[in-house]
UniProtKB/Swiss-Prot annotation:
It comes from the Eukaryota. Residues 1-19 form the signal peptide. Transmembrane segments: none annotated. Belongs to the three-finger toxin family. Short-chain subfamily. Aminergic toxin sub-subfamily. Disulfide bonds join 22-43, 36-61, 65-76, 77-82. Its main location: secreted. The keyword Ligase does not apply. Homodimer; disulfide-linked. PROSITE patterns: SNAKE_TOXIN. One of its GO terms (cellular component) is extracellular region. Keywords: Disulfide bond, Secreted, Signal, Toxin. This is Venom protein SynTx. Pfam families: Toxin_cobra-type.
């Protein structure tokens, strides 16, 4: 039973098989998501103001946090759907 306990604790601690889910688009009906590929452990939201109440927004999975464009902003996070 000690061996079984150690195996269970190891699996829980390693969190084997976990895949991050990030938002890729938003609409009035909700959000569209994707499961991130291996090595992509960050969700991002990159937005830039294009005019009054008009923004160009990109969302998705990434391995590294992207840099903001001129006059743009970036949010990076690492929990499911954190980039709404």
């Amino acid at each position: 039973t000690l061996l079984l306990t150690l195996v269970v604790v190891t699996i829980v601690c390693l969190d084997l098989g976990y895949t991050l889910t990030c938002v890729t688009d938003k609409s009035f009906g909700g959000v569209i998501t994707e499961e991130c590929a291996a090595g992509q452990k960050i969700c991002f939201k990159n937005w830039k103001k294009m005019g009054p109440k008009l923004y160009d927004v990109k969302r998705g999975c990434t391995a590294t946090c992207p840099k903001a464009d001129d006059n743009g902003c970036v949010k990076c996070c690492n929990t499911d759907k954190c980039n709404k």
